[in-house]
């Protein structure tokens, strides 16, 4: 189990009430006078934005997921200066997201994809990976994740409650990520599971065009991309290594190019 999965399992136990109590205890003290409370989704986001934002001006708090963030933001904005940074996910492809002056969204699917969408940063990143024995092609990995990512988009748009965990575990292991492979391994975490047929999925693909530059960076999430790059590395690197290198190479000058910064 990688570091991200460990923190994900811990974060699943966090509730909005516990989170509000924790914030009240940690943020409301004289050391944070004048600071803006900034909510981020998870541990990886916390590490990234802690490096990018001026610590003396902000107090960054992980909310252990977007559902908790959505629940507590309306309460917190009434009490103190508060902003939230949330993954845009499929926002550019029709997914409904909260509209609020206090809610900011990543330029692309998440912070990882927003960083890698920049040509200069992506070139530096791939060069460092190559120096560490991981000579991979991001474009190939993105293309291979196309069907799975549209499957996930379909699930979000229609709330089909599909459990992708069995497939997610195979992204770094299997040669093909086609419809048959995906459909054969997905499960359901509720009785409301809907069987997404091949024809239905193709209908979603046709009906959800995105007139955006680098649309694949809106469609694919960073977790899946890193796992696919692990597959193409032949086991040379793992997801934690890829994530750590992205954080290590990210500079304020990179962050300042993003619409999120402005």
What positions do the PLM features span?
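Acidic, divalent-metal-binding catalytic cores of TOPRIM
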Residues: 1-262
């Amino acid at each position: 189990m990688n570091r991200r999965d460990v923190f994900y399992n811990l974060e699943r136990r966090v509730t909005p009430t516990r989170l509000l109590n924790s914030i009240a205890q940690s943020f409301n003290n004289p050391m944070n006078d004048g600071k803006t409370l900034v909510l981020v989704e998870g541990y990886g986001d916390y590490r990234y934005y802690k490096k990018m934002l001026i610590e003396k001006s902000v107090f960054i708090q992980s909310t252990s997921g977007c559902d908790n963030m959505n629940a507590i933001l309306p309460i917190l904005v009434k009490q103190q200066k508060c902003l939230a940074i949330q993954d845009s996910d499929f926002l550019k492809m029709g997914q409904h997201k909260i509209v609020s002056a206090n809610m900011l969204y990543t330029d692309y699917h998440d912070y990882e994809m927003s960083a890698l969408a920049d040509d200069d940063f992506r070139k530096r990143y791939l060069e460092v990976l190559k120096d560490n024995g991981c000579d991979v092609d991001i474009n190939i990995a993105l293309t291979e994740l196309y069907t799975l990512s549209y499957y996930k988009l379909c699930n979000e748009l229609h709330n089909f409650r599909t459990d992708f965990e069995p497939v997610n575990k195979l992204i770094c292991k299997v040669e093909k990520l086609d419809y048959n492979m995906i459909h054969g391994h997905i499960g359901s975490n509720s009785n409301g599971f809907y069987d997404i047929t091949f024809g239905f999925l193709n209908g979603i693909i046709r009906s959800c065009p995105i007139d955006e530059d680098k649309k694949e960076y809106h469609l694919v999430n960073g977790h899946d991309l890193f796992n696919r790059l692990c597959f193409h590395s032949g086991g040379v690197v793992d997801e934690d290594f890829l994530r750590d290198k992205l954080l290590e190479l990210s500079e304020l000058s990179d962050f300042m190019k993003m619409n999120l910064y402005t």
